[in-house]
């Protein structure tokens, strides 16, 4: 199973490296999301740049690239910790895509897909917290910064073996939002 773990970890990274925001913007003749809007290759920036349809497709694609490797790992009976590390690899692919000069997105939708595969109640909690925070603040980055860490106590209680990889995943997402944190603290963060 160790070799299957490494095979799936590599697959997850390579799948995570497929940036739906970049691919869909190229296919539709829209500007590269890394060079326009917020500069992020993700669904929120695609909503700003290309509208709802491409944003939804980006969101679903990014979510699926986190979910699919977990489902495959589960089908191969890899343990929950291994599945969690495979999910981290998918998010790393999204953050640092080999196909796009290691300039990717922030990993929120991909992380949601990972959580959906690992422990659906944690994904439901994260999505509900994200939607509520977005509704109340109109700030996508703040929603991500609240929703992702909020899942950790639930995972510690219900899936403790997934806690370490999901803590690493949370730290990656918070780190990737460090510019947004500065803007939030300075009152400059973009709102919808």
From Swiss-Prot:
Q: Name one GO molecular function term.
A: acyl-phosphate glycerol-3-phosphate acyltransferase activity
> What GO terms fall under cellular component here?
plasma membrane
* Enzyme kind, highest EC tier: transferase
Annotated signal sequence is none
Q: Where in the cell is it found?
A: Cell inner membrane
Q: How does it sit in the membrane?
A: Multi-pass membrane protein
Q: Where are the transmembrane segments?
A: 4-24, 54-74, 80-100, 112-132, 154-174
Q: What Pfam families does this protein's entry cite? A: G3P_acyltransf
Name the InterPro entries for this protein. G3P_acylTferase_PlsY
Q: How does it assemble?
A: Probably interacts with PlsX.
Q: Which family does it belong to?
A: Belongs to the PlsY family.
Q: What protein is this chain from?
A: Glycerol-3-phosphate acyltransferase
Q: Which organism is it from?
A: Pseudomonas savastanoi pv. phaseolicola (strain 1448A / Race 6)
Q: Which gene encodes it?
A: plsY
